[in-house]
From Swiss-Prot:
This is Flagellar protein FliT. Disulfide bonds: none annotated. Homodimer. Interacts with FliD and FlhC. GO terms for cellular component: cytosol. Residues 1-50 are annotated as: Required for homodimerization. Belongs to the FliT family. The keyword Chaperone applies. The lineage of its organism: Bacteria, Pseudomonadati, Pseudomonadota, Gammaproteobacteria, Enterobacterales.
Length: 121
């Protein structure tokens, strides 16, 4: 049984999933990005399984190489966007912790407490 066309199709599907994940990260749709991750992982596992079953020819490897490059580029961009988001969340958690400390320290004194404001635009 020739699995080469199926392997090529699986790679095309992985490219589509990779592009979807990049779009979701670019649009800051974090919940949807996380939800799409399992389909991406399953597609990678399917490709690994198919690649074990057949030994792709040199020609096939040359055809797959641009797709692999695109997937790796997309993955790198998604990781960069996720790192930016993680940094934003860490900053928010830090601000929340400071606000909680201020409220805890001065909250029982009956006066007004001025907490730091969020200056994000």
């Amino acid at each position: 049984m020739n699995h080469a066309p199926h392997l090529y199709f699986a790679w095309q599907q992985l490219v589509e999933k990779s592009q979807l994940m990049l779009r979701l990260a670019t649009e800051e749709q974090w919940d949807e990005l996380i939800a799409s991750e399992m389909a991406y992982v399953n597609a990678v596992q399917e490709i690994a399984h198919l690649t074990e079953e057949i030994d792709p020819s040199t020609t096939m490897q040359e055809q797959l190489r641009p797709m692999l490059r695109l997937i790796l580029d997309n993955e790198s961009k998604v990781k960069q966007l996720l790192q930016i988001r993680m940094d934003e969340l860490a900053k928010l958690v830090g601000q929340s912790s400071v606000q909680k400390s201020v409220l805890s320290a001065y909250g029982d004194q009956g006066g007004f407490v001025l907490a730091p404001q969020d200056n994000f635009s």
